[in-house]
Structures are given as structure tokens and as C-alpha cells.
Regions:
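Binuclear metal-ion centers of metallo-dependent hydrolases, dominated by the metallo-beta-lactamase
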Residues: 1-4, 78-89, 162, 166, ...
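Catalytic metal-binding/acid-base residues of hydrolase active sites
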Residues: 46, 72-73, 103, 137, ...
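Structural motif
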Residues: 20-21, 41, 68, 132, ...
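A short acidic, amphipathic alpha-helical/loop segment
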Residues: 53-61, 160-164, 189
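Short internal beta-strands
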Residues: 63-71, 172-179
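Active-site metal-binding motif and surrounding structural segment of the metallo-beta-lactamase
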Residues: 27-69, 145-148
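Core dinuclear metal-dependent hydrolase active-site scaffold
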Residues: 1-35, 83-143, 155, 160, ...
Length: 212
């Protein structure tokens, strides 16, 4: 598996014959020219996870790609989209994608909680090869190989980021959702996640593929 980070929560997961793009949002850049996608997978409706303005062109460039999103998000998009419910199991190429969780993390008690799907991808080598939680601290009940772990968010303290990484305890982790952190301050967050866990933690260079 190769992972390419396009900033914030946008990650390209290339499994060889099957390629998935997660959360192409408005804080992410460089994904616009991607072709050959098998699927585009959206965790929830917030614009930093799905840029409705750039999505149609991305779909036009990838006519064979399915678009998956929760029902709330699907209803807001002006493009064909397959609605995903918690508990669904999707077959995309030689991959199995499971839809888990269901709810966005609480930002504030006065802000309504929206849908959020955490996606767990299995390949022929590992049933939980890669997990993208979106904006949620969902802890699966099985071992995860590579976790895209939120580094910072309006709905999360750094202590919660550390505790979440400890709770999931993946074999390896890569940080996402760092677009709200000034570049010069990101090392503070990454340092806590590295020093306070025993996880193999790797920061992905933007727009460069890394093999796992």
C-alpha cells in the first residue's frame, strides 16, 4: 500500500490495482490532477473534507470512480453519490471497505452533531489495513495496521489526540487534520503523539507517495 497526503484530511491510498481518495476538501491541494481512481470516499459534509466546487472536475477526470458518502453529505452534493450507512460493507476492486462509527465528534453542546463515517479498508494481506476516522475518535474492536490519526481539531484537545492513538494502538500511524495548525507549530503536536505513545508514527510528506 502506498499513501500520499494532499494536506489536512485528504489521503490517497494506492493498493496497486485499486486506488482510493479520501476527503478531498478545501484545505487540501494537489489532488485535482489525479486520474485512475477506483473510488472517492467522503467521511462527512464539512468543506474541509469535501470541496463541492472541485469535486465535479475530479469526478469528470475519473469516470470509473464511485463516490461514497453518508446520507447527509450525499443530499448536499450535486453529483451522483452512493449513500453509505454504518454497518455497510463495500467492495471496491479487490478491497473491502467497512463503514463504522456514525457520528461526528462533539464540537460544542449547542452545535448539532452530524453524520461521520469512519472507514476501515481491508486488502488481501490485512482485514484492517488502513483506517480513516474522519472527524471522530472512533475506536474499532480489532487491530489496525495503519491509522490516519487526527493531530488537531476544534473538537479535540491534544490530550484526546494522544489518548485516541493509544486506544486504537495501530501498528503504524500517520497524522491528518493538521491543516488548522500553523506549519511552524505542527512539530509540537507531532512531538506529543510521538513521545507519549509507542506507535510507529510517521509524518507523510505532502504529495509524495510513501510505501507501507
Amino acid at each position: 500500500m502506498q499513501l500520499t497526503h494532499f494536506g489536512h484530511s485528504c489521503v490517497l491510498a494506492d493498493f496497486g490495482h485499486t486506488t482510493l481518495l479520501f476527503d478531498p476538501g478545501n484545505f487540501s491541494h494537489g489532488f485535482e490532477g489525479i486520474t485512475g481512481l477506483s473510488a472517492i470516499v467522503i467521511t462527512h459534509q464539512h468543506p474541509d473534507h469535501v470541496d463541492a466546487a472541485r469535486l465535479p472536475a475530479l469526478l469528470d477526470a475519473n469516470p470509473g470512480a464511485a463516490l461514497y458518502a453518508d446520507p447527509q453529505t450525499a443530499e448536499q452534493l450535486d453529483v451522483p453519490c452512493q449513500q453509505v450507512q454504518v454497518g455497510d460493507e463495500l467492495s471496491v476492486g479487490d478491497l473491502t471497505i467497512r463503514a463504522l462509527g456514525g457520528r461526528h465528534a462533539v464540537i460544542h453542546p449547542e452545535i448539532p452533531v452530524i453524520n461521520n463515517i469512519s472507514y476501515l479498508v481491508g486488502d488481501g494481506e490485512h482485514p484492517a489495513r488502513f483506517m480513516h476516522p474522519g472527524d471522530a475518535l472512533f475506536v474499532p474492536d480489532e487491530p489496525i495496521d495503519v491509522l490516519a490519526t487526527p493531530a488537531a481539531a476544534p473538537w479535540m484537545r491534544i490530550s484526546e489526540a494522544v489518548d485516541y492513538l493509544r486506544a486504537v494502538a495501530p501498528a503504524r500511524a500517520v497524522p491528518i487534520h493538521q491543516g488548522i495548525i500553523a506549519p511552524e507549530a505542527r512539530g509540537i503536536y507531532y512531538g506529543r503523539l510521538t513521545e507519549m505513545t509507542t506507535i510507529d508514527f510517521q509524518v507523510l510528506p505532502e504529495e509524495s507517495a510513501v510505501t507501507f
